[in-house]
A protein has these predicted regions:
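Pepsin/retropepsin-fold aspartyl endopeptidases
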Residues: 1-113
Length: 113
């Protein structure tokens, strides 16, 4: 993971791919260490019905040689670090539900001129 504005600032993080999560959740301390800027807040409903709010930023994410700039949430200590479906799609990856591994996905386009 890198700061898209200052690419020299980077950190390695292990994430669980979570197809039920819209955004990726990264520990706040890690995002702060690479100077990711907070750009607002997002509200989310958890599986147990609770509503939480987290700060949002944009980070450059690299997985298996694929790179994308993606929205990330500043995770708190109790949050699980995950790679959300938005980042997976931006990276052109999907979870193989049989093996649990990441694999390239076929991207859809309605039309092209």
């Amino acid at each position: 993971m890198r700061n898209p504005q200052q690419r020299i600032l980077e950190a390695e993080v292990e994430l669980l791919a979570d197809t039920g999560a819209i955004y990726s959740i990264i520990p706040s301390k890690m995002l702060e260490s690479i100077k990711i800027e907070r750009r607002g807040m997002r509200r989310m409903r958890l599986a147990d019905g609770r509503i939480i709010q987290r700060h949002l930023g944009i980070a450059e994410i690299e997985v298996r040689g694929e790179t994308a700039h993606s929205n990330v949430l500043f995770g708190e200590d109790e949050d699980t670090s995950v790679l959300g479906v938005t980042a997976l799609e931006e990276l052109g990856l999907q979870v193989d539900h049989v093996t649990g591994e990441l694999k390239p996905m076929e991207l859809l386009l309605l039309s092209a001129s």
